[in-house]
């Protein structure tokens, strides 16, 4: 019996859609689409303390999620053109996420873990809890770009006030494909927001 699966594979510099066919003994893999990816530098408000005339623009880094979505859809169409598909899997980098409003619509592009705002969030958290306490709860090595610190940094941004849901990048794409907003545990465990013992969101 033949089984055909499609993999959506997104990395920090490129993405691709692959079609795999398993005949019970061997797996044949073929590429259906490939497209570029990378954080986009987005100018923000001007810094009033900058020495240059008019101030220096603060730069944020965001993912062009709609360009990725277009590349994914093209790949899925090509995969379907080549034959029926039994399942779709999604693999992306961790920690980054999209914010959704109360109607389930995306609020702007997802911020990139390469943005300087991550360090601001990390400093605020570590002023309250030390890294050993955090490790005891989430089991993660300290990294300033962990989702926990990004979510704290969100509190200083207006769009976060409109957000009702946050979905990690693969969960966001799965939501767009299926209409179901869910969090997958193994990826959620990279956020720093999951209790490593309880294997659920940490209320603290």
Predicted stretch roles:
Residues 46-47, 54, 76-204:
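Glycine-rich phosphate-binding/catalytic subdomain of phosphoryl-transfer
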Residues 1-109, 136:
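N-terminal glycine/serine-rich phosphate-binding loop of ATP-dependent small-molecule kinases
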